[in-house]
Amino acid sequence: HKFSEDGWDKVMDLNVKSIFFMVQKFLDLLKKNTTPDNPARIINIGSIDGINTPYYENYSYSVAKSAVHKLTSVLAAKLIKDNIICNAIAPGPFPSKMLGSAVEHDYSIISKKNPSGRVGMPEDIAGLAIFLASRAGQYTVGETITCDGGLVASAGHDLTND
């Protein structure tokens, strides 16, 4: 496959630059009224494709999501002194337009190959985000947490071949 430079830039801009410049824009607001006992939170969305080498040739997406994970740790290291906690969630397979187009919206093969036996549900991400935004997640700083049904913890995540 050939990938266009414009396409690459669009994916990087959407996934990496947008996070950095949004944090920069809202930094004063994030700092306002925070304390060590009540910090502000930033929760970025990465992907397991930024952790493992994906099956599909989604070069820019994988690189961008890996950059999101690194940006998360860099921001966390710099912002914790201002009582701002930064973490990331790295989802695995969830029903979406992007994944759906790759599997013709038939998630059954992915479910069979996932150690959990299913694809993700909105509640899976919501629960993790609630934890990270709550007092219970307040001591978790700079982490990228997978939400993938065990794919990264297992041998890999090639969900397409039998």
Task: Kindly give the residue locations of the regions a language model identified.
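Substrate-binding pocket helix/loop in short-chain dehydrogenase/reductase
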Residues: 1-9, 99, 110
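Active-site loop-to-helix junction immediately N-terminal to the catalytic Tyr of the SDR YXXXK motif
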Residues: 3, 53-62, 74, 102
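Active-site helix of classical SDR
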Residues: 23, 64
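Alpha-helical segment proximal to the catalytic Tyr-Lys
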Residues: 28, 77-78, 138
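Residue(s) in the substrate-gating loop at a strand-loop-helix junction
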Residues: 47
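Short, small/polar-rich loop/turn modules that mediate ligand/substrate recognition or access, typified
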Residues: 80, 85, 140-142
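C-terminal substrate-recognition "lid" of short-chain dehydrogenase/reductases
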Residues: 118-147, 152
